[in-house]
């Protein structure tokens, strides 16, 4: 009896184990089936696989982040093609630089005119007469630095090397040469000194009035204002500053400047390097002497102040930066300082600083006519109002030289 029961128990145990295994296998299959159904989500009709072009683009982006791949590409490039690209880039930069320079000069001109009008400065009548369509390129603008007390000097220049009346207009129209006496205004605008200049200007019409208070210690500021104002009024190749006690041969000056017309950033004059004077009370004392080093040092090379010329781009540079250019006690030093930190061509021409007769006379007889003549001992022609006619007679180039000259 017990054996029978034991056999039945064994048979049931076997059957239960078999069904257990089958159930496990079935559950596993069902689980796998539902799992695949959940993860295999149908793709949306709006989605697409990346195209070949997109795949290539991804590849390029990934390679662009790989320095090694970039290096290999650059090495494989044709050297001539690289040089061509460099040359094209250089040309493009030059064109851009010229465009920027032109825009800067136009901006400077507009700014100078606007400031003059806003400040109500007693400028020359030429400013009001100037119209945009009338603007032309001149050879040079010659500004004769003068003072309220220098009426006799001005008259002596009008009687010698500065053409008057219709001849001066002809000089502007045919030769492209502008000549003006340059002066500012007194501390009391509209006073007797200003009225005297206005009356003289009505008679001769040869003044350029500046928005500047006259004073010997303000020559650096006057020089800066002159170049800025002249640049805003006349488009010229060169801008010249000369003192009113110096004799000038205009044709020779023009021929000298024309030789340098194609050069950029030209600064022409008799270059010198005098001592920096730290002692108070002496002439040409430099209050900021300590900026030039130890006692006994000399200034950097700069053109002597009796006569010098700068090219158009340098006049533009002064006009644009006039509010930040530092002024030293001596105006010729100031001008040299403004150019010391930029790429400027300094031209030392000793014909711009000849002595009075017999020096300039001997040179004229030898065929080497001087551009300017004066006495070094007086920083100009000594007693110029009385002696300049004699200098003109013995050292002048002659009126025919001016009208026959071609610039």
Curated annotation (Swiss-Prot):
Listed GO biological process terms: protein glycosylation
Question: Where, per UniProt, does this protein localize?
Answer: Golgi apparatus membrane
Q: Please give the pathway this protein is involved in.
A: Protein modification; protein glycosylation
Q: Which GO terms describe its cellular component?
A: Golgi apparatus; Golgi membrane
- EC number, as in UniProt: 2.4.1.-
| Topology versus the membrane | Single-pass type II membrane protein
Establish whether keyword Nucleotidyltransferase is in the entry. Answer: no
Top-tier EC class? transferase
The UniProt transmembrane annotation reads 13-35
Question: Coiled-coil ranges per the record?
Answer: none
**Cofactors:** Mn(2+)
Q: Which UniProt keywords apply?
A: Glycosyltransferase, Golgi apparatus, Manganese, Membrane, Signal-anchor, Transferase, Transmembrane, Transmembrane helix
Its predominant location is Golgi
Task: Give yes or no: UniProt keyword Transferase.
Answer: yes
GO MF terms here are: hexosyltransferase activity
PANTHER family (alphabetical): BETA-1,3-GALACTOSYLTRANSFERASE 2-RELATED (PTHR11214:SF367), BETA-1,3-N-ACETYLGLUCOSAMINYLTRANSFERASE (PTHR11214)
State its role.
Answer: Beta-1,3-galactosyltransferase that transfers galactose from UDP-galactose to substrates with a terminal glycosyl residue.
Q: Which family does it belong to?
A: Belongs to the glycosyltransferase 31 family.
What name does this protein carry?
Probable beta-1,3-galactosyltransferase 2
The species this protein belongs to is Arabidopsis thaliana (Mouse-ear cress)
**Which gene does this sequence derive from?**
B3GALT2
């Amino acid at each position: 009896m017990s054996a029978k029961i034991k056999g039945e128990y064994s048979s049931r145990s076997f059957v239960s184990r078999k069904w257990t295994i089958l159930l496990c296998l079935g559950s596993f299959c069902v689980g796998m089936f539902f799992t695949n159904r959940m993860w295999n989500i149908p793709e949306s009709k709006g989605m697409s696989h990346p195209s070949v072009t997109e795949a290539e683009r991804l590849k390029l982006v990934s390679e662009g982040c790989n320095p090694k791949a970039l290096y290999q590409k650059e090495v494989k490039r044709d050297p001539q093609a690289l040089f061509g690209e460099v040359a094209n880039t250089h040309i493009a930069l030059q064109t851009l630089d010229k465009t920027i320079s032109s825009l800067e000069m136009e901006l400077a001109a507009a700014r100078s005119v606007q400031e003059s009008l806003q400040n109500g400065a007693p400028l020359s009548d030429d400013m009001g007469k100037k119209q945009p369509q009338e603007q032309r390129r001149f050879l040079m603008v010659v500004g004769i630095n003068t003072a309220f007390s220098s009426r006799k000097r001005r008259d002596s220049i009008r009687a010698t090397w500065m053409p008057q009346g219709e001849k001066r207009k002809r000089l502007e129209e045919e030769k492209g040469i502008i000549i003006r006496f340059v002066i500012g205004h007194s501390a009391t605008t509209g006073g007797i000194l200003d009225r005297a200049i206005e009356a003289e200007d009505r008679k001769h019409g040869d003044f350029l009035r500046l928005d500047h208070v006259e004073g010997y210690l303000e020559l650096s500021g006057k020089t800066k204002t002159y170049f800025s104002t002249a640049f805003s009024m006349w488009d010229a190749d060169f801008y010249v500053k000369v003192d009113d006690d110096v004799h000038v041969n205009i044709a020779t000056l023009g021929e000298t400047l024309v030789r340098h017309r194609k050069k950029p950033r030209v600064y022409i004059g008799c270059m010198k390097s005098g001592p920096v004077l730290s002692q108070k009370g002496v002439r040409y004392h430099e209050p900021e002497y300590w900026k030039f080093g130890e006692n006994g040092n000399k200034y950097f090379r700069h053109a002597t102040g009796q006569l010098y010329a700068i090219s158009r781009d340098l006049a533009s540079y002064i006009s644009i930066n006039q509010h930040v250019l530092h002024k030293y006690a001596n105006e010729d030093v100031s001008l040299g300082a403004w150019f010391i930190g930029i790429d400027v061509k300094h031209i030392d021409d000793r014909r711009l600083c000849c002595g009075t007769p017999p020096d300039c006379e001997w040179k004229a007889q030898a065929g080497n006519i001087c551009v300017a003549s004066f006495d070094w001992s007086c920083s100009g022609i000594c007693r110029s109002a009385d002696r300049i006619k004699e200098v003109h007679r013995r050292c002048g180039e002659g009126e025919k030289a001016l009208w026959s000259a071609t610039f």
